[in-house]
């Protein structure tokens, strides 16, 4: 594709030399070290470093031109031979150029975007599952992986950056996908990563405290999430949780004809449930929808999973799926790795062990409340908090575990570059003196100790890391999987 054709999509680019107007762009790179002959380098400003400052490395590697911010040009002025193009809006420039280069793949798929603090991963998996059951080829992009039939790749971000995102969408189109289901993070919306993606369905699950190390406050966090439902992104219907305060605000802000609300108990919502019966292996009841009512049996436990189920049902109903087909598929849903995932080494195991990704105050509370009815003995919670992240949620999480669990093991999560002991102290600040938690900084030892100390009938909840198979210590990522450590401890326990 010619450079002038790409830049025609961007109104904030200046100073394109005429000699380069017909230059052929072979690829787009945002990493200067990855550039090769014929590539276009887009240097994105970051929170710590402006990637545009590395344009000399990109040009030296063969890039035909570099698009960078005015600040990067000022800090590292180009010499005569280097073609450096300045853009006042790098976010929009990158997204627009990437979408154009890959042939606007988002327009060739029916896209579903799911945003919210909690529930994105389960909801997107449910939507993908229902579409697949209807024999509709679907691409899934989210926290765990990007996948479609015949392809799977571990994810590095909940929502890929613009160039990678457009490339993956194009690959999905080429693979024959008709639908794309995407977790859309607040970071992605604030940074414009999904510009150029017209969503047929936008889902809002909830908003609770998280990412306040990035967003200035909850209103800023909400404003980022709400972008998904602006005309720039949403072309079809919004599916919004009416049980959430921020969801109620969104419902009021949008045109009623564009919204389907959902609620587990409120019959005034467009989608709701009745006749709920909670059983050891899931929930049964009736789902009420604008397309009719249907009985269902779900293997998922917890009210929050009923909310996720309603959101997914609403999304695929709007996409044209048959309600009875959806209901027939629900009992077959296999679940999501690291989300209320049971760890079992034999069917006669005398304790239950559950691994879950809960890493916010709200999700941790939901996990503990959902697990309680299925644990006849004591509920033991092993948890920590991530380093270099919002410190204010740590004492809140400590308080929640102190109130809802019978025994608390406070340990490390991903401390990153922060002092692990300071993280533990922040958590302990929320635990009242009347509760005596066990504090073990080494997560592997904490898991082993909790499982070995458990008595028959107890349940051990390993919260915070879920599907993750790594731990970040300093700047190093080491292999660590809660499920592996749990199995090892369960095996040791059987030999006692």
Swiss-Prot record:
Its main location: cytoplasm. The keyword Transit peptide does not apply. Coiled coil: none annotated. It comes from the Bacteria. GO terms for biological process: cell division; cell wall organization; peptidoglycan biosynthetic process; regulation of cell shape. Carboxylation is probably crucial for Mg(2+) binding and, consequently, for the gamma-phosphate positioning of ATP. Meso-2,6-diaminopimelate binds at residues 389, 413-416, 464, 468. The modification N6-carboxylysine is found at residue 225. Gene3D superfamilies: Mur ligase, C-terminal domain, Mur-like, catalytic domain, MurE/MurF, N-terminal domain. Its cofactor is Mg(2+). ATP binds at residues 116-122. UDP-N-acetyl-alpha-D-muramoyl-L-alanyl-D-glutamate binds at residues 32, 158-159, 185, 191, 193. A motif (Meso-diaminopimelate recognition motif) lies at residues 413-416. Disulfide bonds: none annotated. Pathway: Cell wall biogenesis; peptidoglycan biosynthesis. Keywords: ATP-binding, Cell cycle, Cell division, Cell shape, Cell wall biogenesis/degradation, Cytoplasm, Ligase, Magnesium, Nucleotide-binding, Peptidoglycan synthesis. The keyword Translocase does not apply. It catalyses: UDP-N-acetyl-alpha-D-muramoyl-L-alanyl-D-glutamate + meso-2,6-diaminopimelate + ATP = UDP-N-acetyl-alpha-D-muramoyl-L-alanyl-gamma-D-glutamyl-meso-2,6-diaminopimelate + ADP + phosphate + H(+). It is found in: Cytoplasm. Its EC number is 6.3.2.13. Catalyzes the addition of meso-diaminopimelic acid to the nucleotide precursor UDP-N-acetylmuramoyl-L-alanyl-D-glutamate (UMAG) in the biosynthesis of bacterial cell-wall peptidoglycan. This is UDP-N-acetylmuramoyl-L-alanyl-D-glutamate--2,6-diaminopimelate ligase. It comes from Nostoc sp. (strain PCC 7120 / SAG 25.82 / UTEX 2576). The gene is murE.
């Amino acid at each position: 594709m010619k450079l002038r054709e790409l830049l025609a999509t961007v109104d904030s680019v200046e100073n394109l030399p005429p000699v380069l107007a017909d230059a052929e762009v072979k690829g787009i790179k945002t990493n200067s070290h990855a550039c090769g002959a014929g590539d276009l380098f887009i240097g994105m400003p970051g929170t710590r470093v402006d990637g545009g400052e590395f344009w000399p490395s990109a040009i030296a590697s063969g890039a035909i031109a570099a698009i960078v911010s005015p600040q990067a040009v000022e800090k590292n002025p180009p010499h005569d031979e280097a073609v450096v193009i300045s853009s006042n809006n790098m976010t929009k420039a990158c997204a627009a150029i990437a979408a154009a280069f890959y042939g606007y793949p988002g327009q060739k798929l029916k896209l579903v975007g799911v945003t919210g603090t909690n529930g994105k991963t389960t909801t997107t998996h449910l939507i993908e599952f229902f579409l697949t059951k209807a024999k509709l080829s679907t691409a899934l992009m989210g926290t765990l992986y990007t996948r479609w039939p015949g392809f799977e790749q571990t994810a590095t971000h909940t929502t890929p950056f613009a160039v990678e995102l457009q490339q993956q969408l194009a690959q999905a189109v080429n693979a024959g996908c008709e639908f794309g289901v995407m977790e859309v993070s607040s970071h992605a919306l604030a940074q414009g990563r999904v510009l150029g993606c017209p969503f047929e369905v936008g889902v809002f699950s909830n908003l609770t405290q998280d990412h306040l190390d990035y967003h200035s406050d909850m209103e800023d966090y909400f404003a980022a999430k709400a972008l998904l439902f602006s005309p720039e992104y949403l072309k079809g219907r919004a599916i919004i949780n009416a049980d959430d305060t921020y969801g109620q605000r969104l419902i009021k802000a949008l045109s009623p004809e564009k919204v389907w609300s959902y609620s587990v108990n409120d019959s005034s919502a467009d989608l709701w449930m009745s006749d709920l019966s909670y059983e050891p292996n899931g929930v049964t009841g009736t789902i009420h929808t604008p397309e009719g009512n249907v009985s269902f049996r779900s293997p998922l436990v917890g009210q929050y999973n009923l909310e996720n189920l309603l959101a997914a049902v609403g999304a695929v109903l709007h996409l044209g799926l048959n309600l009875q087909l959806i209901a027939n598929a629900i009992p077959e849903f296999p679940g999501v790795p690291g989300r209320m995932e049971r760890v079992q080494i034999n069917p006669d195991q005398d304790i239950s062990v559950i691994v879950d990704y809960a890493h916010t105050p709200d999700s941790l509370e939901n996990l503990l409340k959902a697990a309680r009815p299925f644990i006849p003995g004591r509920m033991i919670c092993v948890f920590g908090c991530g380093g270099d992240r919002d410190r204010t949620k740590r004492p809140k999480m400590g308080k929640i575990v102190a109130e809802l669990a019978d025994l608390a093991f406070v340990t490390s999560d991903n401390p990153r570059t922060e002092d692990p002991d300071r993280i533990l102290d922040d958590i302990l600040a929320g635990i009242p003196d009347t509760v005596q938690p066990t504090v073990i900084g080494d997560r592997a030892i904490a898991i082993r100790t909790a499982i070995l100390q458990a008595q028959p009938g107890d349940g051990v909840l390993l919260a915070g890391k879920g599907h993750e198979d790594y731990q970040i210590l300093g700047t190093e990522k080491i292999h660590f999987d809660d499920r592996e450590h749990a199995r090892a401890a369960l095996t040791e326990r059987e030999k006692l």
